[in-house]
Regions:
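P-loop (Walker A) phosphate-binding loop of NTP-binding proteins
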Residues: 204
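Long, basic/Gly/Ser/Thr-rich N-terminal segments
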Residues: 1-160
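N-terminal pre-Walker A segment at the start of P-loop NTPase domains
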Residues: 163-190
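ATP-dependent NMP and nucleoside kinases share a basic, alpha-helical "lid"
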Residues: 280-328
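Pre-Walker A (Motif I) flank of P-loop NTPase domains
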Residues: 194-199
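Hydrophobic positions on the alpha1 helix immediately C-terminal to the Walker A/P-loop
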Residues: 212
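Conserved lysine of the Walker
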Residues: 209
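Conserved nucleotide-sensing/catalytic segment adjacent to the nucleotide-binding pocket
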Residues: 223-226, 232-286, 291-294
C-alpha cells in the first residue's frame, strides 16, 4: 500500500488525510457495501456521467492511456487488488451497463479486514511528514477520530472534489487491466446489428486466458468454448501430427462442432475430451448467443479461417509464466510444460504469425496496477 499512497500523493498533491484514508478503505473493502439494486446503481452512474465535470476525454483514435502516474486518465490503482475506473472511459465507447456490472460484481466479491485497514493506516502515518507532506500529528488526530467512529466509508474532501472532480467506480483491478478489451467489445456489440460477435483469446500458457474468459462470462453472459476440451484423441497422436505447427489440438473437430455452429439457431453441441480417461466424455450444449469467446492456445488456428470479429493475444514474461504454472500445476507438470507444451505453442505462434495477426496484444502482469 505504501507505493500506492505515494503515487496518489504525487499525482494529486491537494489530497488531504481524508482522501488517503478513503483510498486505504477502498483497497481493503472496495465500495464498502453490496449493491442490492443494480438497476438503481446503473441509473446513478448514468446521471453522474451526464453531469460530468471533467470535460471531453479527447482520446486520440479512441486509445486508452497507459497505466501509471502520467497515464491515469481512465484507470488508476487503488491497491489491494482494486482500481478506480473513471467514468471518462465511457467517452471511449465503454457502456455504462458494463462498468456498472464491474462495480456490482466487485462489490459482491471483495473481502477485506479491519486488521488490513489498520495496517494501511499505519503505513500512512509513517509516510506523513516524509514522502507525503502532511503534518503527521494532524493526520494522527484524524485517524484517531476515524477509528473512534468505527472505520466507516468516507467521502472525498471538499478540496479534493474541487481540484480533481473525482468520478469513478471502484472495481477489481482485473477489470482495469483489460479495460481496452472491454471498450473494444462494447463497440463491436453495439455495431453488430443482431449478428453474432465472435472473439478468440489466444496466447502463452499462464498468461491468464481462462481468467479473462471468466471475466467476460460474468460481464456479458457470453458463451465460452475452451480449446482444452479438444485435445487430440489417441488415434490422432502420430509423429506427423506433432510436427505440424498447431497440430497439438483437434482443430478439425473444433471447427465442425463449434466454429461452424456459432450462428446456428440450434446452438452448439460437442463432447469434451477427457485426458484422464483418454476418450470423449460429457456432452456440452450451448444455446446461440450474441457473443461467443473461443479461449485457449490454438484458438486462432488458420484452419478456422476468417471467423472472428476480434483476435486477442495474451502474453506474460517468462519468469512470471513459469511461476504461475508452478503454482497452478506443480513442479512435475511445470517440467512437462517447459519440455513439451510451451515449445509446441511457440512453434505455432511463430509459424502462423499468431501474435502479429492479433488486433489486440495484451501483457498480463501481476503488478500492472
Amino acid at each position: 500500500m505504501r507505493e500506492i499512497l505515494i503515487r496518489h500523493w504525487e499525482h494529486y498533491p491537494r489530497m488531504e488525510a481524508q482522501d488517503l484514508v478513503k483510498l486505504i478503505y477502498q483497497s481493503e473493502f472496495g465500495g464498502g457495501h453490496l449493491i442490492r439494486d443494480p438497476g438503481e446503481s446503473l441509473r446513478r452512474l448514468q446521471a453522474e456521467y451526464e453531469a460530468r465535470e471533467w470535460g471531453a476525454a479527447g482520446a486520440q483514435n479512441g486509445a486508452l492511456a497507459a497505466s501509471g502516474p502520467d497515464g491515469w486518465k481512465y484507470v488508476e490503482p487503488a491497491g489491494g487488488g482494486m482500481c478506480r475506473i473513471k467514468l471518462a472511459a465511457l467517452d471511449l465507447g465503454l457502456e455504462a451497463v458494463t462498468l456498472n456490472r464491474m462495480f456490482v460484481r466487485s462489490a459482491a466479491e471483495v473481502k477485506g479486514s479491519v486488521s488490513g485497514l489498520k495496517a494501511g493506516l499505519g503505513e500512512l502515518l509513517g509516510l506523513c511528514g516524509a514522502e507525503i507532506s502532511l503534518d503527521r500529528e494532524a493526520a494522527r488526530a484524524y485517524i484517531r477520530a476515524y477509528e473512534g467512529e468505527g472505520y466507516p466509508a468516507v467521502s472525498h474532501s471538499p478540496a479534493y472534489r474541487e481540484a480533481y472532480h473525482p468520478s469513478y467506480r471502484i472495481v477489481n483491478a482485473m477489470y482495469g487491466r483489460f479495460l481496452p478489451l472491454f471498450v473494444r467489445i462494447d463497440r463491436l456489440l453495439g455495431e453488430a446489428g443482431g449478428r453474432t460477435v465472435n472473439i478468440a483469446v489466444d496466447g502463452m500458457s499462464g498468461s491468464g486466458k481462462s481468467t479473462l474468459a471468466k471475466l467476460l462470462t460474468g460481464l456479458y453472459g457470453c458463451n465460452v468454448f475452451h480449446m482444452d476440451d479438444f485435445f487430440l484423441q489417441p488415434f490422432q497422436r502420430v509423429p506427423e501430427r506433432f510436427r505440424e505447427p498447431g497440430g497439438n489440438v483437434d482443430y478439425e473437430r473444433f471447427k465442425t462442432q463449434v466454429i461452424d455452429c456459432l450462428d446456428s439457431p440450434q446452438g452448439v453441441e460437442y463432447q469434451v475430451y477427457d485426458c484422464g480417461a483418454q476418450r470423449l466424455s460429457k456432452t456440452v450444449r450451448a444455446p446461440r448467443r450474441a457473443f461467443n469467446v473461443i479461449e485457449g492456445s490454438y484458438s486462432q488456428h488458420p484452419y478456422f479461417g476468417n471467423c472472428y470479429d476480434l483476435r486477442v493475444f495474451l502474453e506474460v514474461g517468462e519468469d512470471e509464466q513459469r511461476e504461475r504454472i508452478r503454482r497452478r500445476n506443480g513442479e512435475f507438470m511445470l517440467r512437462r510444460f517447459e519440455e513439451e507444451w510451451i515449445p509446441m505453442e511457440n512453434a505455432y505462434f511463430t509459424a502462423c504469425n499468431i501474435r502479429e495477426n492479433s488486433q489486440m496484444v495484451l501483457t498480463n502482469r501481476d503488478q500492472m496496477l
